[in-house]
């Protein structure tokens, strides 16, 4: 498997893990289809994700790969906007967040990151 293919496979597997973790806690969660420049995130939590619809950008960086909180949260914001626009929803009803895999740890040890301004309507 090429490096690019292995990275994509690791990312897809992590998205499934995240979706299944939320489902096991009775959240309505789905993986979202890739849409290129109009991508809408990796996983959607349909209701009551800290009072909103959650759009999750899932990241599973490999060993030696940098963690880019600023870039990833910006990506989540853009994709949340795409999700809202495609469905005619107010952006205020969407909470963009990033889920980052903790290497060598269980899914419950992943990190959930969002901007304070996104949570508190900055």
Protein language model regions, located:
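Catalytic phosphate/metal-binding cores of nucleic-acid and nucleotide-processing enzymes, i.e., regions
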Residues: 1-122
């Amino acid at each position: 498997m090429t490096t690019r293919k292995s990275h994509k496979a690791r990312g897809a597997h992590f998205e499934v893990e995240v979706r299944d973790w939320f489902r096991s806690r009775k959240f309505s969660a789905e993986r979202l289809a890739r849409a290129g420049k109009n991508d809408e995130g990796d996983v959607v939590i349909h209701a009551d994700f800290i009072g909103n619809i959650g759009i999750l950008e899932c990241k599973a960086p490999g060993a030696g790969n940098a963690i880019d909180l600023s870039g990833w949260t910006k990506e989540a914001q853009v994709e949340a906007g795409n999700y809202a626009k495609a469905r005619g929803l107010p952006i205020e009803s969407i909470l963009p967040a990033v889920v980052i895999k903790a290497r060598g740890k269980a899914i419950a040890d992943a990190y959930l990151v969002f901007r304070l301004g996104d949570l508190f309507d900055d």
